[in-house]
């Protein structure tokens, strides 16, 4: 049984920058607070905490004064920076450049009077930071098919509107949502304007901005191809990782024999067996943009040592 590791998987540049930065800061100045998990991968967080990183919540952050706090790649809302200034907290800011640019664009459109929609997950750290750019007035849409009335009833279809996306969401879902919103805006306009001579200026201004990180979206095809090349796929990611959920589905769609794990202890013998109890010929190990390469390598080595050995075949 051959075990292959997908070398295109692993940290995106934003996460890698944050990890490198926090390690450098701790080497130079000792232990450091991190506002929230630096990455949505429990194994990597545990490794960094052993080096001196202390993860804190926003409530704990509010009690701190005269100290240093690390801002992860997900970014933060303006209120975090205001509080830091008031409490003499030095922020080591590792906000991903892609996220930072998105924050700026959302603020620009909001300041121009646009209703802001965000394709993403309510409560996700990045989304919290994005909503903060528009006074928390953004409407977050999780369902591309507009099936959740609780989400859609908040939208004012008479206003000029712009749609953005959380950077780690799937492109397929974004463009499905874009098309569905365009249809609803068009229907709403038609219902409000029965006069065929109505001018185009009456049509509400709806724009959609694809702000999904290309390091995320470009992995889709590569992961799908990698999954098809292997008889069994082990996808490694943190349970909290939004990107992990998206990329796992990409692998699962390409190869039904795909399994999600957070670490090697979750591996199951049955995954590597065919219906006739013979071993699969190849296993592919891959992961999310928040999955360290060392964890995937560790999983691959465990599979080789435990499941691909001759003694396993004979057992």
From Swiss-Prot:
Metabolic or biological pathway: Isoprenoid biosynthesis; dimethylallyl diphosphate biosynthesis; dimethylallyl diphosphate from (2E)-4-hydroxy-3-methylbutenyl diphosphate: step 1/1; Isoprenoid biosynthesis; isopentenyl diphosphate biosynthesis via DXP pathway; isopentenyl diphosphate from 1-deoxy-D-xylulose 5-phosphate: step 6/6
Active-site positions on this chain: 126
Catalytic reaction list: isopentenyl diphosphate + 2 oxidized [2Fe-2S]-[ferredoxin] + H2O = (2E)-4-hydroxy-3-methylbut-2-enyl diphosphate + 2 reduced [2Fe-2S]-[ferredoxin] + 2 H(+); dimethylallyl diphosphate + 2 oxidized [2Fe-2S]-[ferredoxin] + H2O = (2E)-4-hydroxy-3-methylbut-2-enyl diphosphate + 2 reduced [2Fe-2S]-[ferredoxin] + 2 H(+)
Key words, A-Z: 4Fe-4S, Iron, Iron-sulfur, Isoprene biosynthesis, Metal-binding, Oxidoreductase
Domain of life: Bacteria
A Pfam family assignment: LYTB
NCBIfam families, alphabetized: ispH_lytB, PRK01045.1-1
HAMAP family: IspH (MF_00191)
Functional summary from the UniProt entry: Catalyzes the conversion of 1-hydroxy-2-methyl-2-(E)-butenyl 4-diphosphate (HMBPP) into a mixture of isopentenyl diphosphate (IPP) and dimethylallyl diphosphate (DMAPP). Acts in the terminal step of the DOXP/MEP pathway for isoprenoid precursor biosynthesis.
PANTHER family on file: 4-HYDROXY-3-METHYLBUT-2-ENYL DIPHOSPHATE REDUCTASE
Name of the protein: 4-hydroxy-3-methylbut-2-enyl diphosphate reductase
Organism: Chloroherpeton thalassium (strain ATCC 35110 / GB-78)
